[in-house]
Amino acid sequence: MAETVHSPIVTYASMLSLLAFCPPFVILLWYTMVHQDGSVTQTFGFFWENGVQGLINIWPRPTLIAWKIIFCYGAFEAILQLLLPGKRVEGPISPAGNRPVYKANGLAAYFVTLATYLGLWWFGIFNPAIVYDHLGEIFSALIFGSFIFCVLLYIKGHVAPSSSDSGSCGNLIIDFYWGMELYPRIGKSFDIKVFTNCRFGMMSWAVLAVTYCIKQYEINGKVSDSMLVNTILMLVYVTKFFWWEAGYWNTMDIAHDRAGFYICWGCLVWVPSVYTSPGMYLVNHPVELGTQLAIYILVAGILCIYINYDCDRQRQEFRRTNGKCLVWGRAPSKIVASYTTTSGETKTSLLLTSGWWGLARHFHYVPEILSAFFWTVPALFDNFLAYFYVIFLTLLLFDRAKRDDDRCRSKYGKYWKLYCEKVKYRIIPGIY
């Protein structure tokens, strides 16, 4: 269970604030970008005149077509997750001493999804621009539907947990927000967090990136170079994610954060709306960068995505070989750390202190943030709202780095202190 580091009042207030304000923010972001020319000032003026009633008036009502799109997409991804073949992959040992098993078929599902989506458009069966035209209704349906989904997860955690990595802290708000189960499943093979985080959330990022590109083409008869750079970089990033999906199952999202509002609602709603927002902005705000500048941005973005990937690959290879590998051409520097599981077993982990992981404890967040900047900067600087995702991601990753440090300090004790003495900086070498 996630530990709280603030007073109970601050903890509850922050959770309730996110529960209350994240849903309307999604609608406000969409409304401002699509209907107010991306101008926060115009949106502020609208609410200055109309007050709370203005939010009620602009909030799209979920329509049948929105529900159909969500259901067809979700069902398609669930079927691919279940039926596509994939390598058997074991996740890390859980706090209760369990080791989850996955089927790594994400990359195949990704290519099948994009090929199907583009094929439906190419042969005139389905126009992806329809998704953009009903985007507000889709986001509205996702907001309410995902909230109900999280309620069902909360109930499942109480009455039918999938493993011993579950339980209540005794507080409804915390249980609902952080979740009851670490690895909730339907049956033995359908992992709910893999579905929400990877197959619905991350897959929607690629699908919507393509959608925005097609919509701009429908409006203007061409696709601007800024949109091309944005779309290519987003697709490269998501392709990297699914190529490395088995590694993602070792991260905090899967291995430490339980399935509650924070993770599941975030992946089902926040990822499709906020993470894709630079592309959403560019639909109606095309920018011609010129070939030279577009290539510079594209190359810089791809380089950052590669460095981010190589950081994760380096650590994954180090763990896979139990430290018997080369890191930047040399034997890796490491710390052998022991810890005790909640069931009382003593385990050991290897902490890598060289390569990318010798620069800072979470250096991989630097190229991650820069990647987001490079697929956003094609929008230039007329409206700062296009950069909301970059700002949000920076705050999220800095907070995640602190939470991970706190968790590892509690888990490894003196070994983590030694690790921090060897790798002094948390994220930015020489600065922080």
From Swiss-Prot:
It comes from the Eukaryota. One of its GO terms (cellular component) is nucleus. InterPro entries: ERG24_DHCR-like, Sterol_reductase_CS. It catalyses: cholesterol + NADP(+) = 7-dehydrocholesterol + NADPH + H(+). One of its GO terms (biological process) is cholesterol biosynthetic process. The chain crosses the membrane at residues 12-34, 64-86, 107-126, 136-155, 195-212, 227-249, 261-283, 287-309, 371-393. The gene is DWF5. GO terms for molecular function: 7-dehydrocholesterol reductase activity. Its EC number is 1.3.1.21. It holds the Pfam family ERG4_ERG24. Belongs to the ERG4/ERG24 family. Keywords: Cholesterol biosynthesis, Cholesterol metabolism, Endoplasmic reticulum, Lipid biosynthesis, Lipid metabolism, Membrane, NADP, Oxidoreductase, Steroid biosynthesis, Steroid metabolism, Sterol biosynthesis, Sterol metabolism, Transmembrane, Transmembrane helix. It comes from Arabidopsis thaliana (Mouse-ear cress). The lineage of its organism: Eukaryota, Viridiplantae, Streptophyta, Embryophyta, Tracheophyta. Pathway: Lipid metabolism; steroid biosynthesis. It is found in: Endoplasmic reticulum membrane. This is 7-dehydrocholesterol reductase. Production of cholesterol by reduction of C7-C8 double bond of 7-dehydrocholesterol (7-DHC). Lesions in the gene coding for the enzyme cause dwarfism. It is a multi-pass membrane protein.
